[in-house]
């Protein structure tokens, strides 16, 4: 079975490794996004999928825009693959590419389709307080994550799990599900998606990391978990990342949202929200290290009555 693998992000690595370990599958090429500057030094860094593929001697193509790169398109066509497999690639495949493999294009998607079609399904599922999510393998078509579904696995969303942790969990489940899908492909009846049940999970905009203290305590906690480690507020003019929080029953009717009402020894500090209060337990100040919120409060002599967001 000849497979071309399309993937870029860390989420795509377990599926590639599973394909490489399967004796009946030959990964004949990988397609990934171009190297990008990363880190404080803006060093040009290869995507995780490229690094794995190159270490195994697999040809890697990195077109800026796949649909416009005629040379790469010609190479892909010449490979005569049975399947194209896609996981967290980052570009929409044009119809010409979808038509190339002999048996089809299969996508590994991090949600229970048709819910959360789009680029960030895991984070938005946590943000919206979903009790479960999962992995779907699907046949690809021109629409965004609209193709017929092949197999699914449902996973409960733990109350404390972050988007980063859930992505890693789903990535490994997706690898196994993809192998099952390929091996059982001829016996699977594709299931059309019900568009009336669909929802969209767009790319995360940096503005969505900023906390609005007028929201409910649960919603802010979901935001902290979903977008970990980037959710933040401001304190004394500097950004303060919020890394973990607990719901609390503390009343706060006499205070406005964003006010700090209690500093609790060895725990953290409570902040007024739109419907009560939230106990912050781990934070990271600008230019500093992740630390217990109590250590931060103690170090900067945090006082009840101060406000965050300023």
From Swiss-Prot:
GO terms for cellular component: cytosol. One of its GO terms (biological process) is conversion of methionyl-tRNA to N-formyl-methionyl-tRNA. Signal peptide: none annotated. Gene3D superfamilies: 3.40.50.12230. InterPro entries: Fmt, Formyl_trans_C, Formyl_transf_N, Formyl_transf_N_sf, Formyl_transferase-like_C_sf, GART_AS, Met-tRNA-FMT_C, Met-tRNA-FMT_N. GO terms for molecular function: methionyl-tRNA formyltransferase activity. It catalyses: L-methionyl-tRNA(fMet) + (6R)-10-formyltetrahydrofolate = N-formyl-L-methionyl-tRNA(fMet) + (6S)-5,6,7,8-tetrahydrofolate + H(+). (6S)-5,6,7,8-tetrahydrofolate binds at residues 111-114. Coiled coil: none annotated. Pfam families: Formyl_trans_C, Formyl_trans_N. Keywords: Protein biosynthesis, Transferase. Its EC number is 2.1.2.9. Attaches a formyl group to the free amino group of methionyl-tRNA(fMet). The formyl group appears to play a dual role in the initiator identity of N-formylmethionyl-tRNA by promoting its recognition by IF2 and preventing the misappropriation of this tRNA by the elongation apparatus. NCBIfam families: fmt. Belongs to the Fmt family. This is Methionyl-tRNA formyltransferase. It comes from Gloeobacter violaceus (strain ATCC 29082 / PCC 7421). The gene is fmt.
